[in-house]
């Protein structure tokens, strides 16, 4: 796989990996509003907003970059709908010819740890 990544970096002339760590606070309001109008202001709507934002990023950057790195915790916080958004994001990235580096480690930085905690039913504390 590393050989493929190196070739893709040479092809794009971009030693860059775009992180796909969707946080609702950073998704444009128009994207969130459209997703909430279709799916509701719930986990499904939040996951749909993330997916739409990811799709836009992927389509705009696919010919410029070699790889993307979706952070699983940012999807898990939206439950099953979030995992579906993660799967669709990965599938689209692959269809667009991008290398996908899954960021699925546990024990991470503050925002990621908070997303893991939220993904576990909003519990006050979790042990990781």
Short names for language-model regions:
Residues 126-128:
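Conserved small/polar residues in nucleotide/adenosyl-binding loops
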Residues 70-82:
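Glycine-rich, proline-tolerant flexible connector loops at the mouths of alpha/beta enzymes
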Residues 19-25, 73-75, 105-109:
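Active-site beta-loop-alpha junctions enriched in small/polar residues
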Residues 1-60:
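N-terminal glycine-rich anion-binding loop in soluble enzyme alpha/beta folds
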Residues 18, 68, 103:
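Conserved, mostly hydrophobic/aromatic
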Residues 102-122:
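Glycine/small-residue-rich loop that forms an oxyanion/phosphate-binding "nest" at active or ligand-binding sites
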Residues 83-101:
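Alpha-helix-loop-beta-strand connector modules within alpha/beta enzyme cores
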Residues 58-64, 95:
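Acidic (Asp/Glu)-rich catalytic clusters
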